[in-house]
């Protein structure tokens, strides 16, 4: 089993820890919790770069090794890093539990060393008709991020 972790933080007080586990060539399970967010839906993605030198802005675009358009997690054609939305409760916290087969922890398309990002707004899953729908899901600014690192 391969395990990874990302510790999320931001200047706005958003914080959390996200865990990634993968058995063999099976899907990757994403679990953890994030606090300090405004209630509602927030886009949740793996971005291409593990670079936070300029905060979450330097994490690059969504992880997209196949060069696809943005989509929903259940879409066959999507960015590998498109994990959809997380639903934040009235207390500002969310418990994450996602199983996804496009974000492996090993091999040429591994997400180790990349970043997980929480956005300010809902991800329209590529279906909103906005000019940004097919690239970012029009999910707004980046409110928190963390680099995905290998865990022992």
Swiss-Prot record:
Catalytically driven reaction(s): 2 superoxide + 2 H(+) = H2O2 + O2
GO cellular component, one term: cytoplasm
SUPFAM superfamilies: Cu,Zn superoxide dismutase-like
Function: Destroys radicals which are normally produced within the cells and which are toxic to biological systems.
Keyword Glycoprotein carried by entry: no
Cofactor or coenzyme needed: Cu cation; Zn(2+)
Cofactor binding note of this UniProt entry: Binds 1 copper ion per subunit.
Record-linked PANTHER family: SUPEROXIDE DISMUTASE CU-ZN -RELATED
Stated family: Belongs to the Cu-Zn superoxide dismutase family.
Quaternary structure (record): Homodimer.
Disulfide pairings: 56-145
Compartments, record wording: Cytoplasm
UniProt KW keywords: Antioxidant, Copper, Cytoplasm, Disulfide bond, Metal-binding, Oxidoreductase, Zinc
Pfam family, one: Sod_Cu
Source species taxonomy: Eukaryota, Viridiplantae, Streptophyta, Embryophyta, Tracheophyta
GO terms for MF: copper ion binding; superoxide dismutase activity
Residue positions binding Cu cation: 45, 47, 62, 119
Residue sites binding Zn(2+) per the record: 62, 70, 79, 82
EC number(s) per entry: 1.15.1.1
Name of the top EC class for this enzyme: oxidoreductase
Protein name: Superoxide dismutase [Cu-Zn]
Principal subcellular localization: cytoplasm
